[in-house]
């Protein structure tokens, strides 16, 4: 008798998030888990001790494990731009890596499952009858709410920034959402 397959909760959640974002018109990206430390530094990553270097990298540009999904999705946006595709709605669900922590047990590195979304260009596909409105913060906010709903989280409260304050991309080597 075959036993039913029981999927880990993280996989069930990742699939629900993927369905919600693809049904909203975003494309899923699958990028390398190896990134360029110089690119991370250019993006403001100032915690080299939090990077895990590969012993045998495939190239100098792919020599550390990704501490964030942002470099990968931004690389996808840039690559589309070089191919004259300015309207991009992309997301990635993937592992990020940090140095080993006590709670990791036998694992050599700390791994976390993250979601990254990047959107740029026009809101609607280019057509003679379509409005030429550009993607704005409200489009991104709407895309961010989809995975929250897919995860079954109820209404979330948000705290607006005080005048003069705003989100920072990276803070102390951890991704910041804002």
Language model segments and positions:
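Extended beta-strand-rich architecture
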Residues: 1-178
């Amino acid at each position: 008798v075959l036993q039913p397959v029981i999927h880990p909760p993280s996989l069930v959640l990742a699939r629900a998030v993927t369905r919600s974002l693809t049904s909203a018109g975003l494309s899923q990206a699958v990028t390398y888990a190896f990134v360029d430390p110089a690119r991370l530094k250019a993006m403001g990553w100032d915690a080299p001790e939090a990077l895990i270097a590969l012993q045998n990298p495939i190239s100098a540009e792919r020599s550390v494990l990704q501490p964030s999904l942002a470099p990968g999705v931004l690389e996808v946006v840039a690559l589309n731009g070089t191919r004259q595709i300015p309207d991009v709605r992309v997301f990635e669900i993937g592992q990020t890596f940090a140095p080993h922590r006590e709670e990791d047990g036998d694992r050599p590195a700390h791994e976390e499952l993250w979601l990254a979304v990047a959107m740029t260009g026009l809101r609607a596909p280019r057509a003679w009858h379509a409005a030429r409105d550009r993607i704005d913060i409200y489009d991104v906010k709407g895309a961010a709410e989809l995975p929250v709903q897919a995860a079954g989280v109820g209404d979330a409260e948000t705290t607006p920034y005080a005048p003069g304050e705003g989100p920072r991309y990276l803070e102390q080597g951890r991704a910041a959402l804002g």
